[in-house]
């Protein structure tokens, strides 16, 4: 049975485009080979320049057995309270990285996330769009 989902909102698409452009700017300036934390602070700088609200290392609580628990999960960047960015600086994206962002989307009841690996020659090859429910 095929499931029908509502399309992604124009606002969310706009935030995704801003995020991809920010990643392109950061990557074209710094290139691959740095720590994830460096790319993260540079992405935050790009969002500030663009006038877009973004939060970094945002705690993701886990509801388990009716109790809200601090499980030490952290979203790398949450753009305007709507879009999750999971940043990586790895040789290649592994299935566990995709599972991680899907879990964050589910736990935070968000719809769209971008998995961005900066350790690639061309940033578009390291950018994956993840849609959840």
Please place each PLM-identified region on the residue numbering:
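A short acidic/basic microdomain associated with nuclease active sites
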Residues: 48-65
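A structural signal for short, well-ordered beta-strand segments
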Residues: 58-60, 75-77, 127
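Residues at secondary-structure transition points
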Residues: 10, 14, 34, 38, ...
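Acidic pyrophosphate-coordinating catalytic loop
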Residues: 64-68, 123-124
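Short connector loops at helix/strand junctions that flank enzyme active sites
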Residues: 42, 49, 55, 70-74, ...
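Conserved catalytic cores of phosphodiester-cleaving nucleases, focusing on short active-site segments
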Residues: 31, 54, 75-93, 104
């Amino acid at each position: 049975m095929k499931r029908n989902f509502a399309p992604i909102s124009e606002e969310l698409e706009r935030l995704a485009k801003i995020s991809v452009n920010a990643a392109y700017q950061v990557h074209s300036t710094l290139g691959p080979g740095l720590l994830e934390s460096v790319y993260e602070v540079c992405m935050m700088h790009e969002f500030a320049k663009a006038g877009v609200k973004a939060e970094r290392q945002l705690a993701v609580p886990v509801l388990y057995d009716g109790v809200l628990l601090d499980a030490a999960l952290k979203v790398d960047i949450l753009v305007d309270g709507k879009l999750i960015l999971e940043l990586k600086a790895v040789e290649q994206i592994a299935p566990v990285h995709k599972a991680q962002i899907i879990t964050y989307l589910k736990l935070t009841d968000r719809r769209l996330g971008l998995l961005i690996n900066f350790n690639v020659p061309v940033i578009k090859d390291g950018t994956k769009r993840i849609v959840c429910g």
